[in-house]
């Protein structure tokens, strides 16, 4: 007659319970991963924006229209301007943020919050993940980006403010695809003479077949570049004009 000890039965039950717990954890994790996130924008609101440079630095505040970015009905960021769909899953949008403008001597007072413009954010509709986009030489006051696919074209400003660059950057690529020096200190002074937002140059113009972008800081500095993946070439028409000018 076969005899089964109580210890063997308890050991088997323990293994079954452990296996069941592992299955529950794996199923829960799989469900959490597959659960879609709800990405939405809230209503537009007008706020006062006091730039640290430009006309607003010593004048009355400028008006900035912002709206919240919500993930699963929770506010994650504030944004301004239109969003650009990179793929069905990813889109980019510019960030708006509040900074504490209180002085050290005002530490006992409530924080003095001021709205400022930030850089670009990359949003994943599936995971709900939000991350900053690396745009070399992008100036949050003077630069305005024109998007095509996963490329951003804009006029960047050097850290000392003495150089203006035509830049094409690609998402998830550290180095820019294009970085052309438009002008030195004199050109920078001319371009920024108005001290207005987004005044580094005209908004770059994209065209397709082939993908190409035109930069125009002023009538004498107009160039069109053809973008092929990570490489860039000056448009043949621009090359002919430069040769004729020599």
Predicted feature locations:
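Blade-terminus and WD-like Trp-Asp/Gly-His loop motifs, strongest in beta-propeller folds
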Residues: 81-87, 143-151, 198-213
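Beta-strand C-termini and the immediately following turn/loop, strongest in propeller blades
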Residues: 94-97, 111-114, 154-160, 215-220
């Amino acid at each position: 007659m076969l005899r089964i000890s109580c210890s063997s039965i308890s050991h088997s039950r323990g293994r079954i319970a452990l296996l069941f717990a592992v299955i529950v954890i794996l199923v829960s994790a799989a469900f959490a991963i597959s659960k879609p996130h709800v990405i939405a924008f809230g209503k537009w609101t007008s706020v006062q924006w006091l730039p640290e440079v430009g006309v607003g630095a010593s004048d009355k505040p400028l008006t900035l229209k912002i709206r919240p970015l919500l993930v699963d009905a929770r506010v994650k960021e504030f944004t301004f301007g239109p969003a650009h769909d990179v793929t069905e899953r990813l889109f980019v949008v510019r960030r708006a943020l509040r900074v504490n403008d209180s002085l050290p001597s005002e530490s006992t007072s409530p924080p003095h919050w001021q709205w400022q413009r930030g850089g670009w954010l990359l949003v994943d509709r599936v995971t709900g993940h939000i991350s900053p986009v690396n745009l070399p030489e992008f100036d949050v006051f003077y630069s305005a980006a024109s998007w095509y696919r996963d490329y951003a074209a804009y006029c960047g400003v050097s850290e000392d403010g003495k150089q203006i660059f035509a830049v094409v950057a690609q998402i998830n690529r550290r180095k820019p695809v294009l970085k052309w020096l438009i002008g030195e200190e004199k050109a920078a002074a001319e371009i920024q003479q108005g001290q207005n937002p987004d005044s580094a140059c005209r908004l770059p113009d994209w065209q397709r077949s082939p993908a190409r972008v035109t930069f125009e800081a002023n009538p004498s500095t107009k160039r069109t570049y053809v973008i092929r993946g990570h490489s860039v070439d000056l448009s043949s028409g621009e090359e002919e004009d430069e040769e004729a000018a020599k």
